[in-house]
């Protein structure tokens, strides 16, 4: 299924018409850093003044996390710079958050922006993530915005056949470009991981090969870790 078609056939059809409806339903960190949240647009502000009488619940609640390069430089332990930004559980609250958060092309260099199932932290040490791994895609600088959005829509819209295997996703902004990683919880389940990788490529109309690395390999071998699965 092409990415555009996938977007039309998910529950986000109606939601896109409501784009920034009611951002008040989630949990927000009130001390945000530069490069993390954008100011409300006039269109968004007009929606926030209206009461949304019907909201469309998602299969799971999700949390946005932000990791800035400034915070990373000050952290005393790996992962301590991660900030819980916003938790949402409905289509409308997702769009309310998404429209007030910098997209990858506007994030500061060295930043990481995560979207994970609520109560799962984007760390190897999290019990749910510990035995998992990641699929990764690379993009030229400033070219990952649409793919990041489609990844979020497919993930929170429960479009993957093995959606229960998915922990979350992260977009990372670096000097050479941007990367999107899809985190899963059971790396040894080859059938599930390969299915997720294939569907992810399909949703994004991504033609290049993508690889899957076990967290255990990444922890032991760092950048020398090899792909266990490729699609």
UniProtKB/Swiss-Prot annotation:
Pfam families: IF4E. Residues 1-20 have a biased composition (Basic and acidic residues). Changing residue 48 to F: No resistance to potyviruses (e.g. potato virus Y (PVY)). It is found in: Nucleus; Cytoplasm. InterPro entries: TIF_eIF4e-like, TIF_eIF_4E. Keywords: Cytoplasm, Disulfide bond, Host-virus interaction, Initiation factor, Nucleus, Plant defense, Protein biosynthesis, RNA-binding, Translation regulation. Disulfide bonds join 129-167. Changing residue 206 to Y: In strain: Russet Burbank-0, allele 1. It comes from Solanum tuberosum. Residues 27-36 have a biased composition (Acidic residues). Component of the protein complex eIF4F, which is involved in the recognition of the mRNA cap, ATP-dependent unwinding of 5'-terminal secondary structure and recruitment of mRNA to the ribosome. Recognizes and binds the 7-methylguanosine-containing mRNA cap during an early step in the initiation of protein synthesis and facilitates ribosome binding by inducing the unwinding of the mRNAs secondary structures. Key component of recessive resistance to potyviruses. GO terms for molecular function: RNA 7-methylguanosine cap binding; RNA binding; translation initiation factor activity. Changing residue 3 to T: In strain: Russet Burbank-0, alleles 1, 2 and 3. This is Eukaryotic translation initiation factor 4E allele A.
